[in-house]
Amino acid sequence: MAENYKLSEVPVGKTCKVKELKVKELLKQRILDLGMVPNTEVYVLRRSPWGDPTAYLIRDTCIALRKEEGDKIIVTMN
């Protein structure tokens, strides 16, 4: 069985799959609108020099999330 991680813990250059969103309703709707639904593959594109925010590639779209947001998205590594 695959191990669970916070999205913010996934190294740059790795791909993971969304398992669960542990966010409040307002942020949850924003994340869902961006296409980050369960079983969606997410590629960690790059981190800013200060480590926050991080750019992710989701369904051919680049989005940036802060660490505090990534901490609430549970993923499995591919």
List the predicted regions and their residue ranges.
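Short alpha-helix capping/helix-loop boundary micro-motifs
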Residues: L27-R30
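Charged, well-structured alpha/beta interaction segments
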Residues: K17, D33-G35, R46-P49
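Short, charged beta-turn/beta-strand-edge "cap" motif at the junction between a beta-strand
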Residues: V23-K24, R46-G51, C62
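C-terminal structural segments of small proteins and small subunits
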Residues: G51-N78
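A residue-level detector for short acidic-glycine micro-motifs
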Residues: E9, E20, V44-R46, M77
